[in-house]
C-alpha cells in the first residue's frame, strides 16, 4: 500500500521484503512533524515478530534489514561511514549497540583490495556511557567523527517504547537522527554533529509509567532471559545487514562465518595449526 502525502505532509508506504512486513512513514514538512511530534525524516519499522534466534529466520531478516539500510545509505556511496554502538555492555537490555560492534572487526576488510565496498572507508566505535566513564558521549562522538573525517554516522542503540506490542518485536530505522534511547539522559542533539545521522535500534525496554498504566504486562512479558535472546538475535541481524550493505560482494555464508568468528574467537599461542592438528592444542570447529 502506498499513500500519497496529504495536507499533513506525511507519506506512508507498506511493503514486504523477503517475506517481512515493512512500514515506512516519511515526514516531509514541519506541519507533519508537528502533527506526529517527530522530526522531519523517514521512519521505517521492520516487523520481525518476537525476536529470538530459536524461532526466526535470521537470514531473511538480515537480508530485509540490509535492503532497508542500502536504500537510506546509498546516497553516501564512496564516502566514509562511521558506525557507533551506544549502550552499556554490562546491562543486557542496553547492550545492543556494543554487541553489534563486537561482531564487526572492520580492519579485516580494509586490506582486501578485491572486495568492492559501498563506502571508501568504514570505522566503528563504542563510546560507552557517561554512567560508567564520566565522559560526555556527544563530545566523544564529535571528536571521533572529526578525526575519522566521517561523512555519515550510523547509530545503533537500544530503544524504549510506550507500546507493549512493539517490545522486542521490531527493528526500527530512522533518517532523522537518534530515536528514543534506552536512557533518557543519553539523548543527544544529533543535528549538531555536522553529518547525517542514520539510526537503527530495537525496542528493548518499556517506560515505567506505561508498565503501570497499561496493566497488560505479565512477569513473562519482559524478563532478563527474554532480553538476552532479543539482543542476541537482533545484534546478529543488524551485524549481518551492515556487512551486506557495506560490502555487497560478501555472500550470505561469508557474513555468517565472519560474525561467528568474531563471537567465538579463542586465544591461541604464536604457532601455526595444521589441518590434521589434534590433541589439546587443536582448534575446535565450534565453541560450545
Functional labels for PLM-detected ranges:
Residues 41, 56, 60, 64, ...:
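Conserved active-site and cofactor/substrate-binding residues in soluble primary-metabolism enzymes
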Residues 46-49, 80-91, 124-128:
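Short glycine-rich or small-residue beta-strand-to-loop segments that form or flank ligand, phosphate
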Residues 122-151:
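Catalytic-core regions of hydrolytic enzymes
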Residues 125-126, 139, 155-280, 284-287:
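A structural signal for small-residue-enriched, beta-sheet-centric alpha/beta enzyme cores
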Amino acid at each position: 500500500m502506498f499513500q500519497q502525502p496529504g495536507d499533513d505532509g506525511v507519506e506512508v508506504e507498506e511493503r514486504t521484503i523477503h517475506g517481512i512486513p515493512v512500514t515506512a512513514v516519511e515526514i516531509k514538512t514541519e506541519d507533519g512533524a508537528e502533527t506526529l511530534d517527530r522530526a522531519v525524516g523517514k521512519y521505517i519499522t521492520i516487523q520481525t515478530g518476537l525476536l529470538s534466534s530459536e524461532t526466526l529466520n535470521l537470514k531473511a531478516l538480515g537480508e530485509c534489514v540490509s535492503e532497508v539500510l542500502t536504500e537510506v545509505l546509498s546516497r553516501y556511496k564512496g564516502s566514509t561511514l562511521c558506525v557507533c554502538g551506544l549502550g552499556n555492555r554490562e546491562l543486557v537490555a542496553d547492550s545492543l549497540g556494543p554487541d553489534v560492534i563486537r561482531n564487526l572487526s572492520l580492519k579485516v576488510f580494509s586490506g582486501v583490495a578485491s572486495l568492492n565496498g559501498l563506502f571508501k572507508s568504514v570505522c566503528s566505535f563504542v563510546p560507552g556511557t557517561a554512567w560508567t566513564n564520566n565522559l560526555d558521549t556527544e563530545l566523544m562522538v564529535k571528536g571521533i567523527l572529526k578525526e575519522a573525517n566521517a561523512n555519515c554516522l550510523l547509530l545503533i542503540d537500544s530503544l524504549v517504547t510506550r507500546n507493549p506490542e512493539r517490545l522486542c518485536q521490531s527493528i526500527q530505522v530512522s533518517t532523522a537522527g537518534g530515536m528514543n534511547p534506552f536512557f533518557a539522559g543519553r539523548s543527544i542533539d544529533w543535528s549538531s554533529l555536522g553529518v547525517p545521522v542514520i539510526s537503527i535500534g530495537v525496542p528493548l525496554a518499556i517506560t515505567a509509567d506505561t508498565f503501570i498504566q497499561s496493566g497488560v504486562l505479565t512477569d513473562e512479558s519482559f524478563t532478563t532471559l527474554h532480553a538476552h535472546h532479543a539482543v542476541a538475535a537482533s545484534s546478529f541481524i543488524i551485524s549481518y545487514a551492515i556487512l551486506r550493505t557495506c560490502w555487497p560482494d560478501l555472500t550470505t555464508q561469508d557474513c555468517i562465518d565472519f560474525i561467528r568468528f568474531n563471537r567465538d574467537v579463542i586465544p591461541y599461542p604464536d604457532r601455526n595449526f595444521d589441518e590434521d592438528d589434534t590433541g589439546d592444542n587443536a582448534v575446535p570447529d565450534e565453541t560450545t
